[in-house]
Amino acid sequence: MGSFVKEETSSLMTDFLEKCGGYAVVDGGFATELQRHGADINDPLWSAKCLITSPHLVTKVHLDYLESGANIIITASYQATIQGFVAKGLSVGEAENLLRRSVEITYEAREIFYNRCTKGSWDFAYAGKASRRPILVAASVGSYGAYLADGSEYSGIYGDSVSKETLKDFHRRRVQILAKSGADLIAFETIPNKLEAEAYADLLEEEDIDIPAWFSFTSKDGVSVPRGDSVVECAKVADSCKNVVAIGINCTAPRYIHALIISLRQMTRKPIVVYPNSGEVYDGLNKKWIKSEGESEEDFVSYVSKWRDAGASLFGGCCRTTPNTIRAIAKVLSDEPSAASKPKFGQ
């Protein structure tokens, strides 16, 4: 499936960015878009529930982001765990098939989009630049805390009984399946502690995973991940992993991103990916979003040039961002000169 899977793992992202003109656009928030289209995701599976009940809505959201200018679309598998599906009454085999299906749906959306480009049957502001533009599919892996659905994905505190081996055993089969699903890369997202990053890195090595990955951490203060580990120390785990082709930050307030990019740029030459939240804060205990006093969607987009100048190469949105956000990011980047003449990282 993946048109870039055959390339050398270490060069996939730098080659892809070159084809995109130096910068690439990642998609945006998924769950809130599913809700906007009528999905009921009040469930421990969250957006992954729609892989069972409403796969057509998953396709719709992917298409919305592709038509907004995204170069990378992320599967609806963030909360899709074998353990979570089994808890809902599915068999292990059915759960594994849903993981594969999350990737298939994304590829189907990409093909629909490409066909629309060819036929000219769609209305998109950047049509002249969009036809057969490079598009990667990233298979999402959420944290152990996302499966627990108890707010611990936002605290990184899993308890003393959860060791690195516990986390490796939990994630192993899901990573194996997604690595063989045809996805172009695996996106390990919203990593809330160093221990889980180490577990992911070990799994990629132990299972001889042969597709690239990115590690994206979350931060509440612009310095540390939720568990309290330094973001830089966590990122060093990713930087030392040969499969990791980009390192970044997601599910974080926009106001912290610039300083985090500078910190990451000082310790890695790998491309940096940033896809922050809209600026609202999630209350994991009460399961609701709290509106930010100081940031709007316009403020979010106004940061993009600053993030680019600080050293980031891939830009998107996480929770509560929309296709409009991504369209605005794509517009900012398309208005900039090509990055081809700028220093290339990871070489």
From Swiss-Prot:
Asked if the Swiss-Prot or TrEMBL record annotates the protein with the keyword S-adenosyl-L-methionine, the reply is: yes
Q: Which residues form a coiled coil?
A: none
Q: Name one GO biological process term.
A: methylation
Q: Which cofactors must be present for this protein to function?
A: Zn(2+)
Q: Name one GO molecular function term.
A: S-methylmethionine-homocysteine S-methyltransferase activity
Where, by tissue, is this protein expressed?
Expressed predominantly in rosette leaves. Expressed in roots, cauline leaves and developing seeds.
E.C. number(s) listed in UniProt: 2.1.1.10
Q: Which residues cross the membrane?
A: none
The EC class name is transferase
- Where does this protein hold Zn(2+)? 251, 318-319
**A Pfam family of this chain:** S-methyl_trans
What is this protein called in UniProt? Answer: Homocysteine S-methyltransferase 3
